Amino acid sequence: MTGAETSVQLYSVREAIAEDLPGAIARVAELGFTRVEPWGFVDKVEQFRQALTENDLSAPSAHAGLVAAEDVQPIFAAAAALGVQTLIDPMVPAERWSSRADIQATADRLAELAGPAADHGLTIGYHNHRWELAQQVDGRPALEVFADLLDDRVVLEVDTYWAAVGGVSVPELLARLGERVQLLHVKDGPITDDPKAQLPAGEGAMDIPAVLAAAPRALRVVEFDAYAGDIFEGLAASLAYLRGHA
């Protein structure tokens, strides 16, 4: 990967997708994105596949619940059908990050899935929220303990905004995690836990140039958990900012 690669997490436009999946994805492509990160695709895989094909979009990564899934095979098959390369679990609840034993259990589960995922051409990853950084185990952020316990085949997608909300220096975190970090969620805002306060990249308190410089080879994935303005305008502004910081 090169640092110039930019994608968008489709959770950002979930309301538009719920109303008109083909139309929403076409609008994302019209903004200038060529890559997307699907979410909620397993039971709509053919609709997503057709929309991606019609708009010349690729999906190098996607989100799906893996750790708690009873049967991962349909998830793997759906991801492979969309050409996904890295399949990322978007969240393990906060209560599962308070002890080393719980963290080990999550790491073990992802390691268990890495082999079967590889049979589908997939790499397994994990995406953080704030609690993996805010909660400490053995005097260190839980996410860093987790990284030490991960199988070498498992990668990280660091949500840079939620990491900052969790109280860490994101550039320093990325430096410590190193090549394990293959993807970044890029977002901006006042660095609070209110999703509706999020802003387009470059308009908030995040030092995004320093963040990008700390992981120059990671795929940049634009995301809004929520946005008070027009979400498509927010995505366009973020993409323009990132193109200016290639």
Residue ranges and their predicted role:
Residues S7, E37, S61-H63, I88, ...:
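Conserved beta-strand positions in the central sheet of alpha/beta enzyme cores
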Residues S12, W39-G40, H63, N128:
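Residue-level recognition of beta-strand->loop/alpha-helix junctions
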Residues F41-V45, A59, G65-A69, Y227:
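Short active-site-proximal "capping" loops at secondary-structure junctions
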Residues M1-E30, V42-V45, A80-V84, H120, ...:
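Histidine-acidic metal/acid-base catalytic patches
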Residues R35, V67-V155, T160-A163, R176, ...:
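Active-site acidic/histidine proton-transfer and metal-coordination neighborhood
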Residues T34-V42:
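A short beta-strand-loop structural module common to alpha/beta enzyme folds
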Residues E46-A64, T106, L122:
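Short acidic, glycine/proline-enriched helix-loop-strand junctions
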Residues V28-R35, D56-A59, R153-L156:
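Short, surface-exposed connector motifs at secondary-structure boundaries
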